[in-house]
């Protein structure tokens, strides 16, 4: 099987927007689930619902791939799986190195979804000499001194950084110098890379903060709604007491002449 060095996905040269590229894995996941259930075709509405997007956006995205489906029939599931996999570069082997084998790095190493999507964990690397040689997910951990040699020997172009923030930039620099051109960064820091190197950042704490913002907003909306709509019993009491205090025109209390 060819390695990652032999190919670059054609999405940039074909002018596919980055937003569309970001949604292709969502479509592929939904299509793979349909394929596993032996579903032969799917409508744009059904696939859009499964992927969590609207059908108009899905049809626009697929137009960049040259796939328009068949009126009254829908999309061929198996063909779309192949087409999207090819566009994402998943029809071949992509060797990956994971640097930083702490709790997060070990969890990534044990993730079973990499191999089925075309990513082979070529090496696990850590700066702790005590980790060297210890197996994680059946792969022996290697010391960072071996980083450059591993990248060159295995033809690695994708690196995953799961180190503490303070070590991430130095690891990034070494990866890039050794020939890595795509980095998935789990370290809570921003990496500086030269032009031509792609970085995707995954910060779980930021995602949780965004969720906290939405939770706070929902709580505020609920509190505002509760304050704007008094209970039914309170409204009835207001009406009954108010009628005794109002004058004949309903605006001021009635005053009897002396």
From Swiss-Prot:
Family of the protein in this entry: Belongs to the transcriptional regulatory Rex family.
Pfam families: CoA_binding, Put_DNA-bind_N
Domain of life (superkingdom): Bacteria
GO terms for biological process, alphabetical: negative regulation of DNA-templated transcription; response to redox state
GO cellular component: cytoplasm
Keywords per UniProt: Cytoplasm, DNA-binding, NAD, Repressor, Transcription, Transcription regulation
Subunit description: Homodimer.
Localization of this protein: Cytoplasm
Taxon lineage: Bacteria, Bacillati, Actinomycetota, Actinomycetes, Kitasatosporales
Region (Disordered): 219-258
DNA-binding region coordinates: 26-65
Biased composition (Low complexity): 225-234
Keyword DNA-binding set for record: yes
Underlying gene: rex
Molecular functions per Gene Ontology: DNA binding; DNA-binding transcription factor activity; identical protein binding
Residues annotated as binding NAD(+): 100-105
The UniProt record lists the keyword Metal-binding: no
Protein name as catalogued: Redox-sensing transcriptional repressor Rex
Function of the protein: Modulates transcription of respiratory genes in response to changes in cellular NADH/NAD(+) redox state. Binds to the DNA sequence motif 5'-TGTGAACGCGTTCACA-3' in the promoter of the cydABCD operon. May play a general role as a sensor of cellular redox balance.
Effect the entry attributes to changing residue 102 to A: Loss of redox sensing
